[in-house]
Amino acid sequence: MARVGELERKTGETFVRVRLEVDGEGRADVSTGVGFLDHLLHLLAHHSGMDLEVRAEGDTWVDDHHTVEDTGLVLGRALDQALGDRSDLVRFADASVPLIEALSTAAVDLGGRSHLTCNTGPLPEKIGTFDTELFPEFLRAFTQYGRFTLHLNCHYGHNAHHKVESGVKALAVALRAAVSRRSSGTASTKGVVD
């Protein structure tokens, strides 16, 4: 059975539509109106092996906050929908990914409990036109509505773009491993994953 999540959300601030296929080929068709977010979503799809379609429209004349956060929210819900009851998942995984001088590690638990620890170290206020304070906001919404735990640590790096990009790549590689199917049993001593 295909592991697919597809949904949309419309509010007075945003309209977001996401289709996510867990067992994809890493294809991305993304347009959010926020260039750096599009870049990060392309990276997430490519390195996780998931196929991702995202369309978002938001009140970016105010700022990018609502669009970025709501994209994370709908993406999380789509992942949650695609993973079903999670009983056959490997569940836990981690990955360290370098990008030139930057190194990040992501550890994930797809066991149904939402938590985010995000340590990027100091970042400038912006990467291009992207407000860097929105990066953890995106991750917070993604983990909360995707019902998973993420510990993301950027160990070091001088270039803010490299630090954030290595973090997203590490998350993607960890997700790729964690969504793999177990050959038998459930990744919980309780017998259920919740």
UniProtKB/Swiss-Prot annotation:
Its main location: cytoplasm. One of its GO terms (cellular component) is cytoplasm. InterPro entries: IGPD_sf (IPR038494), ImidazoleglycerolP_deHydtase (IPR000807), ImidazoleglycerP_deHydtase_CS (IPR020565), Ribosomal_Su5_D2-typ_SF (IPR020568). It is found in: Cytoplasm. Its EC number is 4.2.1.19. It catalyses: D-erythro-1-(imidazol-4-yl)glycerol 3-phosphate = 3-(imidazol-4-yl)-2-oxopropyl phosphate + H2O. Keywords: Amino-acid biosynthesis, Cytoplasm, Histidine biosynthesis, Lyase. It is an enzyme of class 4 (lyase). Pathway: Amino-acid biosynthesis; L-histidine biosynthesis; L-histidine from 5-phospho-alpha-D-ribose 1-diphosphate: step 6/9. GO terms for molecular function: imidazoleglycerol-phosphate dehydratase activity. Coiled coil: none annotated. GO terms for biological process: L-histidine biosynthetic process. The keyword Signal does not apply. It holds the Pfam family IGPD. PANTHER family: IMIDAZOLEGLYCEROL-PHOSPHATE DEHYDRATASE (PTHR23133:SF2), IMIDAZOLEGLYCEROL-PHOSPHATE DEHYDRATASE HIS7 (PTHR23133). Belongs to the imidazoleglycerol-phosphate dehydratase family. This is Imidazoleglycerol-phosphate dehydratase.
